[in-house]
A protein has these predicted regions:
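Short, solvent-exposed amphipathic alpha-helices that sit
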Residues: 47-62, 143-147, 174-193, 207, ...
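Hydrophobic alpha-helical
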Residues: 95-112, 183, 197, 201-265
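Flexible loop/hinge segments that line or gate small-molecule binding clefts
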Residues: 101, 105-142, 163, 260-266, ...
């Protein structure tokens, strides 16, 4: 089936297309299947697996042909995938960038080829914001703030300093940078909250466990709170805490982000205190954005997903509603 982007446009239609798009490239509004090239970070967490499943199931439902690439958490693999999509002349490129920087050159190549780019889940740092059309996903700074607000509200009765250890996400990634920023912004209001250790766990359970073991060896019972940038690291850390003879969720307050089923199971077991939602189910929103481009519509620069926060006491009630 021919890609609609290769169909011949009349001069009048082409002129109208440019006028509607404000000078930015768009797929044309002709018939035929839309081909979307998508580069995924990898499969580092339960969240990412659900995100991939959402995109892969939403594409055929929307009548979109998906060309999918797994970067195995390496930026060089994502850049190769984007260049492959450009060479294949896909209609739209979408990707979730493993880190924020280092994309300028390949995004300029996509723009030169008149292939629009949509970001999902994570942002990029580029000098020219026209290199991508839209970012679909969560407000990571606000997620960090939600975690911080919950901590302040739920430790009012605890006297003295509160020592926090932090499991950061992948170094240089948007969620790691922004969740840290939002959390630090909120706890700065009370000097008694002190981050005594902070290290990357790379968003994985195995690394989360390994780093938490090091935190416990260095600080032991001085640790009052663990703030993990995602649920998988928190779940790994829970294992380390238990192996150290302590009770997660009681001896150490544990706050994490994502809202995956594993986190709800940990809360039901009394081992995790709260999870801040970060929905991976971006597939339908992405496919709608791609179809809107085909129809000649201009996308909002930022499309933010609506998300909540789930403390331990609501976990059992909410668990049957979880889709990931």
């Amino acid at each position: 089936m021919k890609s609609f982007i290769r169909m011949t446009l009349t001069a009048a239609t082409a002129a109208l297309f440019v006028a509607c798009s404000g000078g930015e490239s768009r797929p044309d509004s002709g018939g035929g299947s839309i081909v979307l090239g998508f580069s995924q970070i990898g499969a580092e967490s339960e969240w990412r697996t659900a995100n991939t499943a959402s995109i892969q199931s939403a594409a055929p439902e929307a009548g979109i042909t998906l060309r999918f690439s797994d970067a195995q958490q390496k930026q060089e693999n994502q850049i190769k995938a984007l260049r492959s999509f450009i060479a294949q002349r896909v209609n739209v490129i979408a990707f979730s960038p493993v880190v924020e920087t280092g994309w300028e050159t390949v995004l300029r190549e996509a723009k030169s080829a008149n292939i629009p780019v949509i970001l999902t889940d994570r942002a990029v740092e580029v000098s020219d914001k026209s290199l991508y059309l839209s970012l679909i996903g969560s407000d990571f700074v606000e997620e960090g703030r939600k975690a911080g607000r919950w901590l302040l509200a739920n430790t009012k009765d605890i006297a003295g300093d509160i020592n926090i250890v932090e499991l950061q996400g992948t170094v240089g990634s948007a969620p790691a940078n922004d969740r840290k920023k939002g959390f630090a912004e909120i706890i700065a209001a009370e000097p008694r909250f002190k981050i005594i250790r902070s290290q990357t766990g790379d968003f994985t359970r195995a690394k989360g466990k390994e780093v938490m073991e090091a935190f416990l060896k260095a600080e032991g019972k001085k640790i009052n709170v663990l703030f993990a940038h995602n649920d998988d690291m928190a779940i790994g850390a829970i294992q380390a805490i238990e192996e150290a003879g302590m009770k997660p969720g009681t001896d150490i307050i544990i706050i994490s982000i994502d809202g995956v089923k594993g986190a709800f199971e940990a809360m039901i077991a009394g081992k995790l205190n709260v999870t801040v939602e970060c929905s991976p189910l971006l597939g339908p929103q992405l496919m709608q954005a791609v179809k809107d481009l085909k129809a000649g519509k201009t996308l909002p620069k930022r499309i933010i997903t609506k998300e909540g926060i789930f403390p331990m006491d609501v976990a059992a009630k909410e668990f049957p509603n979880r889709k990931y």
